[in-house]
Amino acid sequence: MTIKRNLVKTLQSIRYQATTATAHAESTLNPLPNAAIPPKYALVTVRSFPSLEPLTFVPVPTSTVAAPLRRDILWRAVVYENDNRRVGASNPPGRSENGFSRRKLMPQKGSGRARVGDANSPTRHNGGRALARTAPNDYTTELPSKVYSMAFNNALSHQYKSGKLFVIGGEKVDLISPTPELDLNRLDLVNTNTVEGKEIFEGEVIFRKFLEEFQLKGKRLLFITDKTREGLIKSSDPYKQKVDVIQKELVEVNDILRAQAVFIELEALEYLAMAHQKEILHSVSN
């Protein structure tokens, strides 16, 4: 009986040690066992245009619409775009191109006044420009593509979290609600009315009512389209000082940050998400 009792105690001790070792190993491998995994996708509402009625939801990567705000990266992207936008066509006259002689305007001594040089001196109001450059001047700067993609996603995320990003679409997804009769599943206005056998385009009237209905008149708006939308361009032409209609391939960080409301087609959002997500993943893998 004593041998059997000792054997049972030994087995229990071995089992306890094995359980303790397993728990210790798990705690070592996972120091935060109760930590939640952050979501990889955010549900974005898809709407019709111009009523902005919700139609359905689509998952969009959180790296595109829910990225944490990084003002430093946004600033680098804005400076990069503005530098590359500079034409560099200025051609100011230098000392050798101003046309004046090299003779001193006054003697070096004896006049009782301060010393002066020739008429080409940059200190004179009609003198040559100091360190004048000859056009063309290249002011472009460089920025890693990974950093620019992060800035682009930051700009979209900032507008989305501020409630100023509206996704328009519904042609390629299952709709929860039907599209209203006078609406479209894209950023366009093609409504016409027939009067005495002639078709009259009413897009400008509809667009004006759209601005008044959602209190957008006088605000800077950005419409990002998948393709060229002639109806939208024609309708927004009277407000071109405040309204920008840009195709998805030509959108910049400046455009997104400058806008007070952004309307983007679902296909364009998918294109931008894949383009900049691929760029980030490619840079990380390298």
Swiss-Prot record:
Native species: Saccharomyces cerevisiae (strain ATCC 204508 / S288c) (Baker's yeast)
UniProt similarity note: Belongs to the universal ribosomal protein uL4 family.
Functional note: Component of the mitochondrial ribosome (mitoribosome), a dedicated translation machinery responsible for the synthesis of mitochondrial genome-encoded proteins, including at least some of the essential transmembrane subunits of the mitochondrial respiratory chain. The mitoribosomes are attached to the mitochondrial inner membrane and translation products are cotranslationally integrated into the membrane.
Compartments it resides in: Mitochondrion
Pfam family, one: Ribosomal_L4
Residues in the signal sequence: none
Stretch forming the transit peptide: 1-26
Keyword terms of this UniProt record: Mitochondrion, Ribonucleoprotein, Ribosomal protein, Transit peptide
Region feature Disordered, mapped onto this chain: 85-132
Gene Ontology, cellular component aspect: mitochondrial inner membrane; mitochondrial large ribosomal subunit; mitochondrion
Subunit structure: Component of the mitochondrial large ribosomal subunit (mt-LSU). Mature yeast 74S mitochondrial ribosomes consist of a small (37S) and a large (54S) subunit. The 37S small subunit contains a 15S ribosomal RNA (15S mt-rRNA) and 34 different proteins. The 54S large subunit contains a 21S rRNA (21S mt-rRNA) and 46 different proteins.
GO annotation, biological process: mitochondrial translation
GO molecular function list: structural constituent of ribosome
Protein name per UniProt: Large ribosomal subunit protein uL4m
Misc: Present with 1200 molecules/cell in log phase SD medium.
